[in-house]
Amino acid sequence: FLPFIAGMAAKFLPKIFCAISKKC
């Protein structure tokens, strides 16, 4: 369960950070 959460976070957090900071 935790590895799945970590995998999803690793996949989506960069996109969210990119959208917020406008640095892609």
Swiss-Prot record:
Organ and tissue specificity: Expressed by the skin glands.
InterPro entries: Antimicrobial_frog_1 (IPR012520)
Domain of life: Eukaryota
Cysteine pairings via disulfide bonds: C18-C24
Principal localisation: secreted
Keyword Transmembrane: no
Keywords: Amphibian defense peptide, Antibiotic, Antimicrobial, Disulfide bond, Secreted
Signal peptide bounds: none
GO BP annotations listed: defense response to bacterium
Compartments, record wording: Secreted
Cellular component terms per the entry's GO annotation: extracellular region
Family in the record: Belongs to the frog skin active peptide (FSAP) family. Brevinin subfamily.
Summary of the function given for this chain in its UniProt record: Antibacterial activity against Gram-positive bacterium S.aureus.
Protein name (record): Brevinin-1Ba
Organism: Lithobates berlandieri
